[in-house]
């Protein structure tokens, strides 16, 4: 039922779509005032970007919070500037999914693979990354599993290390893949404007 409820929330949102530079951009406006923006590769339907924006206590819109995708380049908000500034040495954390896995990349981690430990913390509903040399520690959640009210499984987790980058993968549960497939069908029904058409219209 959880999958259906999240899908119903997405279906009930006001959606606008725009096709530009080989990307399908979808904007969702939810009844509670929250906004979500997604970008998909037009050919593969692979999710490239997902970000959220909520109103603050005074009703003003806050900054976009990135959930999936590359950090913004310098000048596109304070978060992006900060990340670019620190990119020479500090680890950079980002999420970039594939069709079958949620995937996170942590750049600027030079230690060999056997130094890392990646595990699920069931009670906290998060993934924890540690190093045996105590040089790096990171805890992060998987919002998709929270939205679908699904458990986190250690067996779905794997990681690799190459070129000073730790790549963590979590195999998508079948419920999530089914929901993503249904969402793609839903998005095909949304009237899509092209970048030359001007503003896209809300469904």
UniProtKB/Swiss-Prot annotation:
A GO-annotated cellular component: extracellular region
Disulfide bonds: none
GO BP term, example: left/right pattern formation
Matching InterPro entries: DPCD (IPR026224)
UniProt-listed Pfam families: DPCD
UniProt cross-references to PANTHER family, sorted A to Z: PROTEIN DPCD (PTHR31921:SF1)
Biological role stated in the UniProt entry: May play a role in the formation or function of ciliated cells.
The family this protein is said to belong to: Belongs to the DPCD family.
Protein name per the record: Protein DPCD
Organism the protein comes from: Rattus norvegicus (Rat)
